[in-house]
Amino acid sequence: MLREHRSLCDEFVERNISRWAEAFDLLETLIVICTESGEEFNRSYRPQAASEEDVVFDLVVRHHARACHIANEILCLLKNGFADAAQARWRALHEVAATAMFIAKHGKECAERFYYHEVVDSYTGMLEHKKYEHRLEAKGPTIEEIAECKVQFDLLIKKYGKKYADNY
């Protein structure tokens, strides 16, 4: 049963790749160029960015790496015939690219706000987990861990205002 099913799937993938070979090759070429360019850019400029604690550089490079990863997922989904799933990942790719461009355009303060919002997300997540730990049947964070995170959370709210506690 499984052998026959796998054989049918493999045959479909072979036909799909054969039918769309030129398009897949072009997409894969673009992905490789983007990945290698990003690696070289990071290798060349990372030392200076690290010495300057350039959070914009760090976030944009991370987003670029994430975008390359998502692009590879898209290629894999397309080759295997999952066009709708590939389109969903394409929307995620667009979101990552748009976020990186927004951070690059708006500079250091924007990058820091984005970067440190992880503390807000963590604190909110800790509270939710603690609240529902019995339903989840998974031990939530300790009171001490929550308190430690709350200190950082409160400092960020003081710095950026009450609205910073909201989801974006």
Write out the residue ranges for each language-model feature.
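Long, hydrophobic/aromatic-enriched structural stretches that serve as scaffold segments
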Residues: 37-103
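Short, solvent-exposed helix-helix connector turns and helix-capping sites enriched
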Residues: 20, 82, 106-107
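Short, glycine/acidic-rich hinge or "gate" loops at secondary-structure transitions
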Residues: 86-87, 104-114
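Acidic/His-rich structured neighborhood in mature extracellular/periplasmic domains
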Residues: 103, 117-122
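Proteins with a high burden of low-complexity, intrinsically disordered sequence enriched in S/T/G/P/A and R
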Residues: 80-81, 111-113, 166-168
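Secondary-shell segments that build the walls of catalytic and ion/ligand-binding clefts
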Residues: 1-52, 120-168
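Short, amphipathic alpha-helical segments
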Residues: 68, 87, 110, 140-143, ...
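Short amphipathic alpha-helical surface patches that mediate protein-protein
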Residues: 91-94, 115-119
